[in-house]
């Protein structure tokens, strides 16, 4: 009977270390672009990010949006075998699971995905960017490509460590 060695345990990569730097509590200045050409609606939020082991983050996002409590959850990680970041998002105002994949481009993580839009009643292509300013500051933006092919900015979140 031969003994088979166990495969080596996966080790965190540089990308996992970048995600680990997001752990903690963040104050968020939100700008929501409800209608193209109109001033954004502004709100403040708080996001708490925790590590799940060495590979994943889970976040809890909370704010008051249009006079109602808004809560969202995100999970984010990096898949070394596919050389890509992966992320999901759910929130209390939508029955849709958002799923994004993407890569790091300089100091920005750029991810894309498709999700059903309750507003347009169609599947829209979404693009999110997260620009790393410092260990204590980052800027997140979300865009959607509308059915006519025009990309619009949906939101900007400016994160500062609390």
Predicted regions and their residues:
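Hydrophobic small-molecule pocket/channel-lining residues, especially in calycin-type beta-barrels
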Residues: 1-162
């Amino acid at each position: 009977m031969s003994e088979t060695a166990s495969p080596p345990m996966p080790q965190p990569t540089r990308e996992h270390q970048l995600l680990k730097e997001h752990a903690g509590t963040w104050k968020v200045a939100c700008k929501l672009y409800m209608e193209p050409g109109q001033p954004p609606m502004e709100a403040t939020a708080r996001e708490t990010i925790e590590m799940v082991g060495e590979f994943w983050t889970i976040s809890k996002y909370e704010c008051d949006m249009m006079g109602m409590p808004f809560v969202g959850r995100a999970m984010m990680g990096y898949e070394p075998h596919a050389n890509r970041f992966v992320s999901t998002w759910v929130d209390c105002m939508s029955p849709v699971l958002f799923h994004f994949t993407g890569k790091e481009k300089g100091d920005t993580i750029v991810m894309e995905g498709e999700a059903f839009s309750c507003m347009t009643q169609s599947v829209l292509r979404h693009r999110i960017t997260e620009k790393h300013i410092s260990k204590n500051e980052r800027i997140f933006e979300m865009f959607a490509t509308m059915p006519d092919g025009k990309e619009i900015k949906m939101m900007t979140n400016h994160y500062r460590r609390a």
